Design a protein with these regions (language model features):
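Extracellular loop-to-transmembrane helix junctions
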Residues: 2-21, 34, 62-102, 187, ...
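Helix-loop-helix module between adjacent transmembrane segments
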Residues: 49, 72-171, 238-239, 323-330
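Membrane-interface "cap" regions at the ends of multi-pass membrane proteins
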Residues: 1-57, 168-171, 184, 190-196
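Juxtamembrane interface elements at the cytosolic ends of transmembrane helices
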Residues: 16-27, 85-101, 166, 172, ...
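Membrane-interface alpha-helices at helix entry/exit sites of multi-pass transporters
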Residues: 110-119, 260-268, 344
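Conserved small/polar residues in nucleotide/adenosyl-binding loops
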Residues: 342-348
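Residue-level recognition of pore/gate-forming positions within transmembrane alpha-helices
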Residues: 11, 50-51, 78-82, 120-121, ...
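Loop-to-helix junctions at membrane interfaces in multi-pass transport proteins
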Residues: 33-38, 42, 59-69, 105, ...
Length: 360
């Protein structure tokens, strides 16, 4: 019962924040870039929560189940990408743009802008679709596999999609940013609390080593030697390139209250990503030593929340996992929405129509 209660309270709180911020939306700039009002700390929270999506809590955690301590190498690409972004953030904010296609259009013309809008729409709507699927899979796993609910996977996916769309529509980046901060704080707190509990239950490093040995996975205690150099490149290069071109990050730069704020937030983001990714992988690594069912590979943290943690801590971890997926999904939904609004306004300007930014 406590799992239902905590998750329900969490989702209701998200909706309340969305409704409370919706009255602040007066024009497209408010909706798309939060009126360019976000402080460095709010920016750090929203960028971290956006980057830490299903790839972290399901992908990296699931891979860590397979390769063990070598999983700590998986986030390196994203970390290096954030360092590179520290050189870009200030220039992006100084451009005073709303979207990445707008930047491309100002440099290469309208055709390039339209092509970039099409590319973003195609890519990001695909990403949103599998965030819906991931959200549905998590809800299904929580309520069907662990709580015995009759909820089907399709129903769970529809619930996830409806919630994500409704929440994004409420107040755009303004609501997304502030709930992302709450998600970020919840993530750090939850995974820090869970880490020593799981470590103690696993019997420390000695118990983990014995467990991995009994499962025929002794290399899971080794950081190096499991992945070849080519494997490391294969796992890290895509995330490095993704974060460099991630329109979500640029939208946050545009939303910063100043150039210096954007630069400071991106610098702090590096440390936030290092801490959060390491906590997720550490929790998954320790938990994997206690799980014998290979079918739980991609849901290792969900399984751990139910089976290895006290109910209240486990319920908060489940709410955190759902929140991570929601943060990523609504961000990837907001980007194409903003691009379409900008393109539509640009077309109206070409026709001599001036809405004064009131299309929202």
């Amino acid at each position: 019962m406590i799992y239902y209660l905590i998750i329900s309270i969490y989702l209701i709180a998200l909706l309340w924040i969305g409704f409370s911020k919706s009255d602040s939306i007066k024009n497209q700039e408010d909706f798309s870039v939060a009126g360019r009002s976000l402080s460095p700390w709010i920016l750090v929270g929203t960028m971290a929560a956006t980057w830490m999506g299903t790839g972290s809590v399901l992908g990296n955690a699931g891979k860590t189940f397979e390769i063990g301590a070598a999983g700590f190498l998986l986030p390196i690409g994203g970390m290096l990408g954030v360092l590179a972004l520290t050189k870009i953030a200030g220039k992006a904010r100084a451009s005073e743009k709303l979207t990445v296609p707008e930047i491309i259009g100002s440099r290469f013309g309208d055709v390039a802008m339209i092509l970039s809008v099409i590319a973003l729409l195609t890519a990001y709507l695909v990403i949103v679709s599998y965030q819906f699927n991931a959200g549905g899979a998590v809800i299904y796993t929580i309520f069907h596999d662990n709580l015995g609910s009759n909820l089907s996977l399709d129903q769970a996916t529809i619930i996830a999609a409806l919630f994500i769309v409704a929440y994004t529509v409420l107040a755009g980046l303004l609501s997304v940013a502030y709930t992302d901060v709450a998600n970020g704080i919840l993530m750090i707190t939850c995974f820090i609390i869970a880490l020593p509990i799981l470590f103690f239950q696993a019997g420390g490093f000695e118990g983990m080593a014995m467990s991995f040995e009994s499962k025929g996975m002794p290399n899971n205690m080794s950081l190096f030697g499991v992945l070849s150099f080519r494997d490391v490149i294969n796992f890290t290069l895509p995330s490095f390139l993704l974060i460099l071109g991630d329109a979500n990050m640029y939208q946050r730069f545009f939303a910063s209250e100043s150039v210096k704020s954007a630069q400071k937030a991106t610098f702090l983001l590096f440390f936030a990503v290092v801490i959060l990714e390491s906590l997720i992988i550490a929790n998954a690594w320790i938990s994997s030593s206690m799980i014998t069912d290979i079918a739980k590979e991609s849901h290792v943290l969900i399984y751990a929340a139910y089976n290895f943690l006290p109910p209240i801590v486990g319920a908060i971890m489940l709410a955190t996992i759902i929140g991570i997926i929601i943060s990523t999904a609504d961000s990837f939904l907001l980007v194409p929405t903003t691009c379409l609004l900008y393109t539509s306004d640009a077309a109206d300007e070409g026709l001599g129509v001036d809405l004064g930014g009131r299309r929202i």
